[in-house]
Amino acid sequence: MKIYIYSEYQKWIEHSGVGRAIYHQKNAISKTKGMELAECKEDADVIHINTIFPGSVAMARWAKRHGKKVIFHAHSTEEDFRNSFIGSNAIAGLFGKWIHFCYQLGDAIVTPSEYAKKLLQKHGISESIYVMSNGIDLDYYRRQSNDRKNFRAKYGYSEKDKVIMSAGLWIRRKGILDFIEMAKRLPEYQFIWFGDSNLWSVPKEIRKAVRSQLPNLRFAGYVPKKELRQAYAGCDLFWFPTYEETEGIVVLEALAMKIPVLLRDIPVYQGWLADGQNVYTFQSQEDASSRITDICNGEIADLTDNGYQVAMERSMNQTGIHLQKIYQSALL
């Protein structure tokens, strides 16, 4: 069974969750017996589309004309488009209609969580929707002997420093304003954010906020995945204050690296992550501040082994098995 993984503007999306998900798909397919990546669309049995630009629509229509099965990957929802870039809220309704049109071109739809599936169904998408995690490469995301040392040396942190990290685009939805406010609230801890956005694309309040000059706050920008792995290994807490996700690949990476994880209590985590079992959650800045202090001071239970079990359930091996079943179902 040959699979053609299609996406547009790869250089634009490669630093995003979508870009990482595409890498995971290719990795999983190449490691799973009975599947292989097609080098061109003509050789494929299945066309797996990951983007929602006009070229993706054209690809889906071409595939239909040539008897190929189409899998549309629903990485985006109307809900997670809101509170992102300038004007996103004003056009969110139109965006929702557009992705509805795109996704319905698929013989089947794949989305990374039960929560995302419910959102798609709420907006009237009736095609077969399969839930499949974006997956995590456990062979790569594991601690290497010098990762912690290299991270701390690069950013000038001592072994005594308590370092809280997060990752994502510079957009309101990701909770970046909350992250900056927390750095002001807890000056005794070091805060570092990985990832960025073009400043022309984000609202004025975000542009102003990321220029904050705080002695305990650093914006590292986009870094290669090796350096991100070192950051996971070298920090004391992964705090993800996002307000909306379809899954959260960075959460899987943090769980795989066996570091404490603190998440906002939002619906996407229901059914697979639970407060006090494999992660900790918060509902307000006051709540988060208390949890951060408790975790950094070792005053509450270490849940990292339980968190790693969640990552294992979403390993590349499992992703490959799930993809194969989805493709086979589409070909029936």
Where in this protein do the model-derived segments appear?
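Nucleotide-activated donor-binding/catalytic signature segment of Leloir-type glycosyltransferases, i.e.
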Residues: 204-226
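Short alpha-helical donor nucleotide-sugar binding micro-motif in glycosyltransferases
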Residues: 103, 222, 230-235
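Aromatic "clamp/platform" in nucleotide-sugar-dependent glycosyltransferases that forms part
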Residues: 243
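Short hydrophobic beta-strand element within catalytic cores of glycosyltransferases
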Residues: 260-263
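Membrane-proximal helix-turn-helix segments that form the acceptor-binding/catalytic region
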Residues: 90-109
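Conserved acidic donor-binding segment of nucleotide-sugar-dependent glycosyltransferases
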Residues: 273-286, 293-300
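Conserved donor-binding/catalytic core segment of Leloir-type glycosyltransferases
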Residues: 158-174, 180-184, 192
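Glycosyltransferase donor-sugar binding loop
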Residues: 167, 190-205
